[in-house]
Amino acid sequence: GKEKMPKYWLPWLVGMPAETSLAICSMIFGGVFEKFKNLKVCFSHGGGSFPFTIGRIEHGFNVRPDLVAIDNKVNPRDYLGKFYLDSLVHDDMALKYLVDLVGDERIVLGSDYPFPLGEHEPGKLIESLSSLSAESREKLLWKNAAEFLGIKQSI
């Protein structure tokens, strides 16, 4: 199917989210997070398709451990909230789902700047999400990124 990808800008629309999910699954199934317990990683594009296909991924892990759980016996769902994701999902319902799925502690502001699919007003989606508390908004807009980078926050 590679020959179909350039048409309709598909590498950017569906390829990148798929590649991000592939990277997450490869790190989980390869045991990277088990081997490097203190590893801090942030995946762009809200984790790509990974958060939205976690049910399918977990089901595959459970029904075909002979193919999936070869190098790591930990359920992939157990990793939700253990690595960071950015907020660049371009959809209020998707961002709400992401927060509900992984919590507000591991999502950081994503802009994708300077690329054409970047958020034109970084943070606007976060600020517009009425289901987020003021505290959660602050976490997503800057506090989580400061924590990820090891920047001390003074009060």
What residues fall within each predicted segment?
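Mid-to-C-terminal alpha-helical segments outside catalytic/metal-binding sites
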Residues: L39, G48-S49, N72, Y84-L85, ...
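Histidine/acidic residue-rich metal-binding segments in metalloenzymes
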Residues: G1-D78, M93-E105
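Short beta-strand or tight-loop elements
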Residues: G81
